[in-house]
Amino acid sequence: LLNIKDYKGSDLAKFDNIHDVFTVDREWFIDVFKKQPTPTMKIVFAQCESMQPTFTQGDFLLVDTDDTNINDGVYIFKVDDRLFIKRLQIMPGKILVISDNKKYESFNLPSDAVIIAKVIDLWKHDTP
């Protein structure tokens, strides 16, 4: 379980701030995410408000650390030792970083950004 609230600073080695690591039952994983798990899939515990309402604090994000080629989608990336989970949109001559929560401004993805993983699914914390 990767807690991304206080992040400073190929798989788990890409994350500097790991609070807990756990293993989930394969059947549970398939039931919740409707896909077969792979070694590069990780579950991240979201603790941010910048992507509300898409996901909120307490939701679990399924990420793939092998999917680092940028297309339109939600990614975990690092800039200046700071972790972000944001929507990336390819625009002519730039990549736009977008928060789904409109209280946060968009900005251009810096050229030195390091893509850590792509968010490929979500399990809402209030899902039974």
PLM region spans:
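Short, surface-exposed charged micro-motifs
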Residues: R87
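Short, well-ordered loop/turn sites that connect or cap secondary structure elements
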Residues: F55, T68-I70
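Short, positionally conserved secondary-structure boundary motifs
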Residues: L1-Q57, K94, W123-P128
